[in-house]
Structures are given as structure tokens and as C-alpha cells.
Amino acid sequence: MFRSMIVRSASPVKQGLLRRGFASESVPDRKVVILGAAGGIGQPLSLLMKLNPLVSSLSLYDIANTPGVAADVGHINTRSQVSGYMGDDDLGKALEGADLVIIPAGVPRKPGMTRDDLFNINAGIVKNLSIAIAKYCPQALVNMISNPVNSTVPIAAEIFKKAGTYDEKKLFGVTTLDVVRARTFYAGKSDVNVAEVNVPVVGGHAGITILPLFSQASPQANLSDDLIRALTKRTQDGGTEVVEAKAGKGSATLSMAYAGALFADACLKGLNGVPNVVECSFVQSTITELPFFASKVRLGKNGVEEVLDLGPLSDFEKEGLEALKAELKSSIEKGIKFANQ
């Protein structure tokens, strides 16, 4: 969660915004790059990262319309300096010196589409962007939002391996929206404050590969087995719920931007040495037989400091864990195969 912060010189209105935002006063300079900054997720994500005082330089890149987004966001009176870059020739300039690269680039879901339907378009985009990251900012942390995350993270890993720059501690699939949804849905059925809720979500980032661990939720609430099953299903189908509600006019752009900003903030805190920063993310992992898996990870100055064990699972969660493995394995292999074509 974002921690409250107080900027003594801020106006009351600005203080109100920032208390709901991020953290800290005296912090190192950090350059954050958003690839796909002019898109449905990229624009609100750019706004949220502009509000984050951990960011000193905000570099916005897209294939079109980035100058306008940069000019708009750049007028906001917060710490970071904003630069806009557009087109292939500017990609290197956008990336140079980055501490953190966030990738929401690609096409959004439409009604009837699954995340895997996006593969043929978004896989190529992620491959090309990963080649550029390996060339211009190989030491940066990379937060992958572009779907299908279960495949795009392995694509990026393979591209980085080919370039000789791969560091498994620095590549993250952003699954935070699954956690955000699980928290919201759980609180809605429990007599608890949603701001105090935490629910680990493990596995992957599509359909049945999303496995919320409601047995480990805090604060604990006495929910029936049927309700836990319903909450699990709703968490898994949360993206589809939004796509259908928008009736062809978009996907989960605003909540995804919020979740992406949450995870980016956690990564920046880790880089800055804040202790005990733990978030769920889809990373290279040995906690199952699969090469990538989403679970709780401890973040630090080098990215992933520790991949945490799954902890005790209910019988329902154990069943879900076994059920998701085949689909997740297939998605991972699909990404690896694409990257090596």
C-alpha cells in the first residue's frame, strides 16, 4: 500500500492528494521510464508516477502522442522532471539511465478476448522493447504490465539472456491488480476496513492461474467455503468483468494504472533501502517446478531479495495450485518459444 506522506510546503489540497499517495522526503534521484505512456493504462500511470516524490525524472515513451501527454503531466507541480519521447529513434534516449522501466505498451482487451488472444500483437511489442532495454539500460528494474504477463515475462527473460544482460532479480510481472481486486472483494464480504486488508495472490496473471490465498487473508474473517470459491472466481474474472462493463469501450485501465503505480512505488522503496517491502509478483522462481511463478517477494536494492514460500494452503487452494500449473506452464513455454524464433 502507499504510505502516507506529508509535504510541509504543500497546499492543503495537495497535501490531501499526497497523503493518499506515496512516500518520503529526502530520497535519491530515480529515473522512471514508462513505455506505452500515451495509452489507456499509460496515461493514468504517468499521472500517478508524477505524483510520486521518489521519482526525480519521469521519461514517457510511446509510438505516438507522447509530447502531449508529457506536456500535460509536466505542468503538475511535483518533484519529477518530465520528458516525452516518440517513435523508434527516440527509444534509446527515453531509456538511458533508467532505474525502473514500466511496460504497459500493447493493445487492450476487448469483449470476448482473453489475455492470450493479445499474444500475437503484444509479444512482438514486448520483444522489441526488451531488446532496447538490454541495450540502453540493462541494469534497470523492469515491471511488465503488457499482457499476457504469463508469456511476456518469459519473452523478456529470453531476450535479456540472448543479450547477456539477464538478471532474474530485476524482472517482474506486475500481478498487483489481482491483489487489489482480492482485497476489495474480500473486504466487501467481511466486516473489515479494506485499507487494512491483505490477500496474497499466487500463480500467474490470467484466469485460473490467478490463485488468491484467502486462507492467509488478514484480518481474518469467517467466510464460508462457498463464498471463498465465489470470491476466487470473481478475482480470476475481474478483468473480464471490467471489459464487459465497458461494453467494448476499453479494459481495466484505471485500476491497472493504480496497481502498476503501487508496485512501482514498492520497487523504488526497495531500491532506496526501505526494509521489509513485500509484494506479490510474477518472477523467476523455484518454489514450484515451473520456471516463473507469482508469489510474495521481498524487494531490495537489487530488486528481488527473496522469493517467499507459499505458506500453508487450504485444501481448496491446494487443488487450485495443481489445476493452474498446466495452463501456466503452457503460457510460459509459449513465450520462450516466441522469443527464440
Swiss-Prot record:
Expressed in rosette leaves at low levels. Keywords: Mitochondrion, NAD, Oxidoreductase, Transit peptide, Tricarboxylic acid cycle. Signal peptide: none annotated. It is an enzyme of class 1 (oxidoreductase). Residues 1-22 form a transit peptide. It is found in: Mitochondrion matrix. CDD domains: MDH_glyoxysomal_mitochondrial. One of its GO terms (molecular function) is copper ion binding. NAD(+) binds at G36, A37, A38, G39, G40, I41, G42, D62, N122, I145, S146, N147, M256. Disruption phenotype: No visible phenotype under normal growth conditions, but the double mutant plants mmdh1 and mmdh2 have decreased germination rate, grow slowly, are small, have increased photorespiration and die before producing seeds. It catalyses: (S)-malate + NAD(+) = oxaloacetate + NADH + H(+). Belongs to the LDH/MDH superfamily. MDH type 1 family. This is Malate dehydrogenase 2, mitochondrial.
